[in-house]
Amino acid sequence: MPELPEVEHVKRGIEPFIKSAKIEKVTFAKNVINGKNNNRETIIKGMELDTFKKLTEGYVIKKVERRSKYIIFYIADHDDDRILVSHLGMAGGFFVVNNLDEISTPNYRKHWQVIFDLDNKQKLVYSDIR
């Protein structure tokens, strides 16, 4: 499980590339969809995947913070402010890339869970190999 310095490192690594970017599209891996369909709370907890998409697509990433071992994404549209909370778990990671081939570690490239397509033509990818 990542310690505080590693979580801060991830936060600092992604923030300059995603701050002020609009989330245009959210894509879930098949295993995330299958997990939800089988009543397992995987990756997106407490809501349906379609609801998550409706509450994030079209929103701008205003700020990224680290609180303890959590990465907090502050997002907003013209009407609402929202907060996304992420924990890296045992082996999770975020990557900002133009395409999945740019993720240099094969296991992370293969085991992506969620892709946020941004209006700056980059992708914020959450990957977890466990």
Per-segment meaning from a language model:
Residues 1-130:
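Acidic, proline/glycine-enriched N-terminal capping motif
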